[in-house]
Amino acid sequence: MSLTRLNIEAFRNIQFAQLIPAPGINVIYGQNGSGKTSILEAIYFLGMGRSFRSHLSQRVINNDNDKLTLFATLNLARGDSKIGLRRFRSGETEVKIDGEKVKRLSTLAETLPIQVITPESFSLLFEGPKSRRQFIDWGAFHADPQFYGAWTNVRRVIKQRNQLLRNGAVYTHIQFWDQEFVRYAEQVTEIRNHYVDSLNGLLKGIIGEFLPSVDVKVSFTRGWDSKTDFAELLENQYSRDLATGHTVSGPHKADLRLRVGNLPAQDALSRGQLKLLVCALRIAQGKLLKQQIDKHSIYLVDDLPSELDAQHRQLLLKQLTDTGAQVFVTAIDPAAIVDSLHTPPNRMFHVEQGRVTVVE
C-alpha cells in the first residue's frame, strides 16, 4: 500500500500543494517553519482525523480559510482507493472514501495505517501508560476485527459505572454493569495479550539490531492481577471505587512493560537508547501488520538528523527500507538523509514557505 497522490489545501502554512510520492523513501527537506512537518501531519490527519502535534491541533486550518481539505489516492492490493477529508472551523469533520460518506473515523485508520517516528512519539516510553495502551490498541485494532467493538463497549460501561459510583450507588445497582464489564474486559484483554505475544516474536530481533548489548524484556499487564477473578475483584473493590469515584482496576489501566534486568527501560537506558527502542517498536509493529493482514504501514519520520546520530540514522533507514513500506522522512539538510541511505531516495521534495516542489 502506498500514497500515489496527495493534495493539501489550507493546512497550516500550506495554502495548496500537490505531491506525487514514490512507493519507497520520500525525502522532504526545508528550513524550520517551511512546512515540511505539516506534510507529514497532513498525511497523519488524513489517516487518523487528528494531528500528532496535539498541542497545536486547534490551529491546523490556515488563518485565511474556514476549512481545510485533504485528498489522497491510495494504491491498494485490490486497486486504487480515494480518501477525502474536510475539517471546518466549527470542529465538524467530513470524510469520504471512494465517494461514500464515512461516519466513523476508525474507518480512516483501518484504510490508512500510519506509523509515526517524531520527537513527540518518543513519549511512548517517557510518559505514563496511556500512550503505551494506544500503541497496543493500534495493533490490536488492525489485527482483530472484534477489538474495536469490544473496546468501545468497555469504555461505555466504564463511563456508566463511574457515573453510578459518583452518585453513591449501592453495589446491587452496579452489578448489572459489572457483568457486561467483565465480558468485554476479558475479550479486550485476550486480544491485547495475543497481539503483544505476536509482537514479541518480531521485536527481539529488531531490538538486537538497534541495541545489540541490551537485553530488553517486553510484557503486557492487563490492568488487574491476572491470578484474580475480575468479577470478584470488582465486587471486593467496590468500597474503594466508591471512595475514589472511579473504577480503579480494569483494561483501561493496562500497560506495556519494558524492562532491562530489574529496572524499567526508562531508568536503565540512556535517552538515545530509548529513542532507538521506540524505533524498534514502531518497525516491529509495521512488520507485524504486514504479516497479519498483508498491508504495509506508511511511515512518517520527522526531523531524523536531530534525533539520531549518523550511524543510527543509517541503521533506521535500512530497517525502514527493508520493510518495503512507503516512508516520508524530513530534514533541514537532505544530505543528512541521502548520505545515510544505501541507495538514492525514490523521490525528493523541497518545501519553502509552504510551497512544495519536486527535486529532479
UniProtKB/Swiss-Prot annotation:
InterPro entries given in the database record: DNA-binding_RecF, DNA-binding_RecF_CS, P-loop_NTPase, RecF/RecN/SMC_N, RecF_2
Pfam families from the UniProt entry: SMC_N
A Gene Ontology term for the protein's cellular component: cytoplasm
Binding site for ATP: G30, Q31, N32, G33, S34, G35, K36, T37
Domain of life: Bacteria
GO biological process: DNA replication; DNA synthesis involved in DNA repair; double-strand break repair; SOS response
GO molecular function list: ATP binding; single-stranded DNA binding
Keyword field: ATP-binding, Cytoplasm, DNA damage, DNA repair, DNA replication, DNA-binding, Nucleotide-binding, SOS response
Disulphide connectivity of cysteines: none
Subcellular location: Cytoplasm
NCBIfam families: recf (TIGR00611)
Family designation: Belongs to the RecF family.
HAMAP family in alphabetical order: RecF
Descriptive protein name: DNA replication and repair protein RecF
Organism name: Shewanella putrefaciens (strain CN-32 / ATCC BAA-453)
